[in-house]
């Protein structure tokens, strides 16, 4: 079964073996508003936990996308680059940002489960 975890920067990550899918949360899209541009990391690039892995721009603001764990980018979701509005309609499923091969699964331990993330989002107001 795939496990979904959440970061304090409002990214979600779904683990499947040693690969993971990363995107932004529904809460993030609500804060950003209508998404108009997405920039994703290059396939084959290495990313580090909490490092910048792209940009999402909305009618309200531009925000960096951070990777919740370290790894190598193995796939990008070109569909959201071509049509950024898809991120608003289904941010936690079809509008994933990138897939990566994880180099250190223990980094998942510092992330939140759904209940913890919902509490964090409510309490932080961010």
Swiss-Prot record:
**Signal keyword on record:** no
Entries under InterPro entries matching the protein: 2-oxoA_DH_lipoyl-BS (IPR003016), GCV_H (IPR002930), GCV_H/Fam206 (IPR033753), GCV_H_sub (IPR017453), Single_hybrid_motif (IPR011053)
A GO cellular component annotation here is:
cytosol
Cofactor: how and how many bound: Binds 1 lipoyl cofactor covalently.
Which Gene3D superfamilies does the UniProt record give? 2.40.50.100
The Gene Ontology biological process annotation of the record reads: glycine decarboxylation via glycine cleavage system
* Lipoyl-binding domain span: 19-101
CDD domains listed in its UniProt record: GCS_H
What do we know about how this protein assembles, alone or with others?
Answer: The glycine cleavage system is composed of four proteins: P, T, L and H.
Q: Which HAMAP family match?
A: GcvH
Role summary = The glycine cleavage system catalyzes the degradation of glycine. The H protein shuttles the methylamine group of glycine from the P protein to the T protein.
Name of the molecule in the record: Glycine cleavage system H protein
User: From what organism does this protein derive?
Assistant: Pelagibacter ubique (strain HTCC1062)
Q: What is the lineage of its organism?
A: Bacteria, Pseudomonadati, Pseudomonadota, Alphaproteobacteria, Candidatus Pelagibacterales
């Amino acid at each position: 079964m795939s496990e979904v975890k959440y970061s304090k920067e409002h990214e979600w990550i779904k683990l499947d073996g040693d690969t993971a899918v990363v995107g932004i949360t529904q809460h993030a899209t609500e804060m950003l508003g209508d998404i108009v541009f997405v920039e994703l990391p290059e396939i084959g690039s290495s990313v580090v936990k909490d490092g910048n892995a792209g940009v999402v721009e909305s009618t309200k603001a531009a925000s960096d996308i951070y990777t919740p764990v370290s790894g190598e980018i193995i796939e990008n979701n070109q569909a959201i680059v071509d049509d950024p509005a898809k991120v608003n309609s289904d941010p936690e499923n079809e509008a994933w940002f990138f897939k990566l091969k994880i180099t250190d699964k223990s980094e998942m331990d510092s992330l939140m489960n759904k209940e913890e993330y919902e509490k964090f989002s409510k309490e932080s107001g961010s």
